Amino acid sequence: MLSTGILCHASNDCGTESPGAAESFAGYNVRYLGEKVRQRLRAYGCESRIVSVRVLRELESAIESRHQDGDLDERFYRERLSIFRFRPPDDLPEAKSLIVIAVPQPLVRATFVWNGRARRYIVPPTYGASVNTNAEDLLTRTLEPDGYRVAPSALPLKLLAVRTGLAAYGKNNICYVQGMGSFHRLMAFYSDLPSDEYSCGDPTMLERCRKCSACIKACRTHAIDPDRFLLHAERCLTFLNEDTASFPDWVDPSWHHCLIGCMHCQTICPENKGPVHWVEAGPTFSEEETGMLLDDLPLWQLPDDLAGKLKTLGLHESLDVLPRNLRALIDLRGSSPSARV
C-alpha cells in the first residue's frame, strides 16, 4: 500500500492533508485495488474486467429489446432470461462495480458402470460451479482489508462478458475468451469498489467466424442460423437436455453425447484447437450408484459418496434431468451411443 511519506508529499503540511490530495490518494488506491484483483485472478489463469454498474441499464435494454422485437423464443425467454436481476442485491445496495471473471475449465470424463460395462461420458466446461465460491473467497480476501465487499449476481453473463470486452461471440453464440476458447466458466460479482470503467460496446463476433461455417455444419439440431446473429436457442441440444420436458420427437437419440449440454459445435471450432484436448478424469460410478441415478432418487436419498461425486461434476442440482439424459446415453434397450470427444 502507499506509504505515509508519499501521502505527505502530496499535501502542503504533513499534519494537514489537502482535499485534492485526499481525493488523489483515494483514486489511486481504488485503481491499485482493481489492478490487484486482476493480478490475483490472473495468477490462477483467470481473466477479468471491472466495470461500473451503469452497464446494467445496457444489459437490460438489450435483452428486453430482443424480446419485444420477437427475436427470442417465448419459452426460452421465460425459462432462461426472465430470472435476471438488473440491480444490486439487497445485501449490497451501494454496489458501484461489477467484477466479471472467466475461469478456465476442462472437459470432464465421468465413468458409469452398467450391465458390467464401463461407459464414459463427458461433462462440458461451465458446469463446475464450485469455482464461483473460490473466486468469491479470493475477491473477499483481496478487498475486505480495505473495507470493500462483494456479492453474487444474476445477470446474462455471456452478454456482459462480450459487452465489456472480456469475450467475443462465436457464430454459435458461445463466448470465446483469448487463450481459453470456449473452455471456461463465466461469473460476475457486485462490489462497492468504485469503477469509472464503462466500456459497453456492441456485441462482437470473432473475426475468423465470418469465413467459417464449421459449427453450422456440426450442429445436429440446426440451431445455428447462417442468416442471423442470434442462435435459435429453443432448438439447441443444450437447452433441450437442461430442460425437464421430454425430448421432442425430432431429436435423434444418436445426437446425445454429453451427460448435460452439448459439445458438437465446440469440438469442431478452430478457436478450440488447443483447449479441446484438455480432458480431465472425473469420478467413477459403480453399477449400484448408476442404478440409483437411473431410479430418479432425489439428492437427499443418495449416499454421501454418490452425492459428493455429483457435486464434483457440478451436477448435484441437475437430478431433475440427469436420469433421463443418462438413459439416453446408455440406452437401456440395447444400443449405447458413444460420448467420445
Give the location of each predicted region:
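Auxiliary alpha/beta "docking" domains used to position bulky ligands
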Residues: 1-10, 15, 24-208
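Short Fe-S-cluster ligation motifs
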Residues: 240, 244-260, 292-315
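Conserved hydrophobic register position within alpha-solenoid helical repeats
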Residues: 322-327
